[in-house]
Structure formats: C-alpha cells, structure tokens
Amino acid sequence: MPPDAGDPPRPSATPILIASGNPGKVAEFRGLLRAAGVDCRTPSDIGLELEVAETGETLLENAVIKARAFAAASGLPSLADDSGLEVDALGGAPGVRSARWVPGSDDARVKALLEALAGLAPERRGARFRAVLALAWPDGRLLTAEGRVQGRIG
C-alpha cells in the first residue's frame, strides 16, 4: 500500500553528500534534507577535502561537474547546486559568473549592478534568479532540477 500523504518522511537508506564547503549552503540544504527524512553528510563529516573548479559555461554544467566530482570522490550520492542572476538589459549577465563578475563583496556586486542599470526605466530592468540542482550517484546516474524567480532590479 502506498504511503499516505500525511505519513512522516521515511529516512533514506543511503546518506546524501552535500557537495559544498559553503557553511550557509550546507546549513540550508541540511535543514531541508533532514526535514524530508534524508540522512545527509558534508565533506567535513566524512573527511573529504575537494575543490572542484566550476569550468562549465552554464549553471547546469557547473552543478553537474560538482555533483559528479563529489560522488566519485566520496562513493556517496552527491547533491550540488549552482545559481545566478540573469539581467535582461545586460544580455543575461552576470549569469553563471554572478559570484565572480565583480571582485569583492556582495555589496560591491550590488553597487556595480545598480550602476550598470542607472537611467534605465523600470520596465527595462527585468531579471531572474536561477538555481540548478544536480544529484549524482557514483554509478553515473544523474538527476537535475531547476528553479527560477522572475522579477525586476529596483
């Protein structure tokens, strides 16, 4: 008999590795996965030190690169993400390079973005935030998902 929608989530048999060393990202994923009954681990939990270069041209490519690298190194299914802001007036930039398009802090990137859009009418400030997840298994299986939020830069 299938589980009732009100049944509590069942714990996963195999832990999932959160393929990130970013403490904020790890805490967010850990909270979501645990609430769903998923046993999750971090690279530090299993003594794994791995830096993966984000060499992809798209958010999807970067998420897949990271998930596959962590799955291969750990022997565990591994969940990775990549995200970015795409601004219509900037031809979709900064996109996949959102965290690197302006050196420095988030505040510096916000300031640069607002300066780049200065003088544009609100209707020309369309943008979207995209986040892509990739779950890779050591045997090569792969599952991906994407979410996006459409909006306007103030």
Model-predicted regions and their roles:
Residues 2-17, 21-154:
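Anionic-ligand binding patches
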